[in-house]
From Swiss-Prot:
Biological role stated in the UniProt entry: F(1)F(0) ATP synthase produces ATP from ADP in the presence of a proton or sodium gradient. F-type ATPases consist of two structural domains, F(1) containing the extramembraneous catalytic core and F(0) containing the membrane proton channel, linked together by a central stalk and a peripheral stalk. During catalysis, ATP synthesis in the catalytic domain of F(1) is coupled via a rotary mechanism of the central stalk subunits to proton translocation.
Transmembrane segments: 34-50
Chief localisation class: plastid
Note: In plastids the F-type ATPase is also known as CF(1)CF(0).
Descriptive protein name: ATP synthase subunit b, chloroplastic
Subunit: F-type ATPases have 2 components, F(1) - the catalytic core - and F(0) - the membrane proton channel. F(1) has five subunits: alpha(3), beta(3), gamma(1), delta(1), epsilon(1). F(0) has four main subunits: a(1), b(1), b'(1) and c(10-14). The alpha and beta chains form an alternating ring which encloses part of the gamma chain. F(1) is attached to F(0) by a central stalk formed by the gamma and epsilon chains, while a peripheral stalk is formed by the delta, b and b' chains.
Location relative to the cell: Plastid, Chloroplast thylakoid membrane
Organism for this UniProt entry: Ochrosphaera neapolitana
Alphabetized UniProt keyword annotations: ATP synthesis, ATP-binding, CF(0), Chloroplast, Hydrogen ion transport, Ion transport, Membrane, Nucleotide-binding, Plastid, Thylakoid, Transmembrane, Transmembrane helix, Transport
Entry's family note: Belongs to the ATPase B chain family.
Length: 178
């Protein structure tokens, strides 16, 4: 803007000093030559310019068509991608659902198996306890019987003869075997 202002100021100072003036003589100023030259340029150049503009217009239209085709292809690919995404999301949801179902089934199976194992171990422990109790009772009973026999034997040693003692012992031993 500043340059334009400076140019106007210089041009107006030239006009004011008389450096620039209008010459009305057509032949001296070459106005006719300039008009012929300008007309020839327009006449001859218009065809070339017209052809150039038509060619440029065709290139632009071709580029627009190509861009529209690429846009349609991109839109189609976008639709396909969206469809694939939806299908992938459905597959993912199905996989998640299957995984949750499988996890629940595995959890249930593990819990059931654990309960069964606990019941089996408890039953085995109870069975062992019953067996051990029976063994302990038998041992206690055997011990009590042997103590009683010892006591009776001691008491009878002083009162019974050897033959009578032997008969009592044989009878008691046969009862124990039964």
């Amino acid at each position: 803007m500043h340059l334009f202002t400076q140019t106007l100021v210089r041009f107006s100072s030239l006009i004011a000093d008389g450096g620039v003036s209008f010459n009305p003589d057509i032949f001296e100023t070459n106005v006719v030559n300039l008009a012929i030259l300008t007309g020839g340029i327009f006449y001859l150049g218009s065809n070339a310019l017209s052809e150039s503009l038509v060619e440029r217009q065709q290139k632009i239209l071709g580029a627009i068509q190509e861009a529209e085709e690429r846009l349609e292809q991109a839109t189609e690919r976008l639709k396909e991608s969206k469809t694939q995404l939806e299908q992938a999301q459905l597959v993912i949801a199905s996989i998640k659902e299957d995984a949750e179902t499988t996890a629940k089934q595995v959890k249930s199976a593990i819990l059931t198996e654990g309960k069964n194992e606990i019941e089996r171990l408890t039953s085995a422990a109870k069975s062992q306890i019953v067996t051990i109790e029976a063994q302990v009772r038998k041992q206690i009973s055997d011990y009590v019987v042997s103590l009683a026999l010892q006591r009776v034997t001691l008491q009878l040693e002083g009162k019974l003869s050897d033959a009578a003692q032997q008969q009592i012992l044989d009878r008691n031993i046969s009862k124990l075997k039964d």
